[in-house]
Amino acid sequence: MWTALVLVWISSVLLPRSHMMSAEPRNIVTNKWPKAVNQSMLRDTVPRTDNTFTERTAIVPPAPVTLTTETWAATLNSTRVTAEVTTHGTNTSTPTTREGTTDRVTSRTLAVPTSSGPSSAEQTRPTTIAGLPSLSTPHAEVPRTNASVSPRTAMAATVAPHTATLAAGTVNTSDPHTRTPSPAKSTPTDTSSKNPIPTSGAQIQGTTVQLTTDQPVHSTAGRSALSPSNATLEPTTTQVQTKEPSASTVPARATSLSPDVDVISPTTQPSPTLPTQGTGGPGTLLTTEQVGTKTTSGTASAGPTSRSSGDIKVPTTDSCQPSTQGQYLVTIDALTPSLVNKMLLLVVLLVGVTLFIAVLVMFALQAYESYKKKDYTQVDYLINGMYADSEM
């Protein structure tokens, strides 16, 4: 009983102290306090259960001193561990963080041992402060990491001008590209005007091409008459026609000139309107020539159809008539199978209905016979059999 009372009194004395220590800020090892108390209590009480009550009372006062020293040693160890963890964290995080964050981390770790405690713990504080230079060394390493960060920022700064020079390079390259299209566009037009010369394969066409290259500059700039425009457009039509039909004869070319003049005549009407919009630029002349060649290519594609028919207006009506006749024929072909299918369906329906009626009649006859024979007995069946045999 006395031992139990002593233990209760010791626990009642030590528990308020533990609560007071837990109320202080940055007391990380408050959970370890009861464990240390229990261990110290077991060490002090278990071997001395046989002693007298006076010895137990003498044991009580030194117990808190030993507990405080042990707990503060535990707290120092905990602070060192946390400081090491934080320094490792700063070493890993310094490449991305700033100096202010590392200073804050070190200040937090240094603020841990400054917590208030008993006098026995104050004697141990100078040892902890003397031991904290190990903590200050990572703080000395922090500017190194910052210094290592600064060359990276310098590298980033050096990269920035590279990017700026690249952007300038792109701008400079884009400027010549924007400047070059005008000669680039002019050169393909010249090549397009020169390409038909070897493809024509005739000396007469070569002379006509020279006339076209010389005439549009003078005729479109100064002359607005339709006769030179017709003269210039005729050889272009011959060139396009020589490109499309690979194996075309010379008389066919001669015959193609007469219908093509009628087809190109509407194209000559918009040609004088174009120089009225812009007469002072050679670029407009090139565009008019390109449009003329495109229109003649379209007319040339229509040219072979006119040759096959012979006339210009009649083939259009002929081409429309066969299409309509074909449509009528297709509709007639579509109607005849539909009628045949309807007749077949009707025949199948009639045959099916007749078979169904025949089956119903057969079932009705069998039902009627069975209805007559419902009152027959075995003797009747024998008599009927005898009569049947006699009849046979």
Curated annotation (Swiss-Prot):
User: Which keywords label this protein?
Assistant: Cell membrane, Glycoprotein, Golgi apparatus, Membrane, Signal, Transmembrane, Transmembrane helix
Q: Which residues are glycosylated?
A: 77, 172
Q: Does the keyword Coiled coil apply?
A: no
Composition-biased stretches (Polar residues): 107-127, 170-249
* Subcellular localization, as worded in the UniProt entry: Cell membrane; Golgi apparatus, trans-Golgi network membrane
What is the recorded membrane topology of this protein? Single-pass type I membrane protein
Q: Where is this region: Disordered?
A: 83-154, 167-320
Cystine crosslinks: none
Residues in the Cytoplasmic compartment per record: 364-392
Q: Transmembrane ranges?
A: 343-363
Amino acid composition bias (Low complexity), ranges on this chain:
86-97, 265-277, 284-309
The signal peptide annotation in the UniProt record is 1-23
Question: Per UniProt, what is one Pfam family of this protein?
Answer: DUF5585
Which cellular component appears as one GO term in the record? plasma membrane
- Superkingdom, natural source: Eukaryota
Is Cell membrane included in the keywords of this UniProt record? yes
| InterPro entries in the cross-refs | DUF5585, Erythrocyte_Invasion_ImmMod
According to UniProt, the name of this protein is Uncharacterized protein C11orf24 homolog
Species of origin reads Mus musculus
Q: What is the lineage of its organism?
A: Eukaryota, Metazoa, Chordata, Craniata, Vertebrata
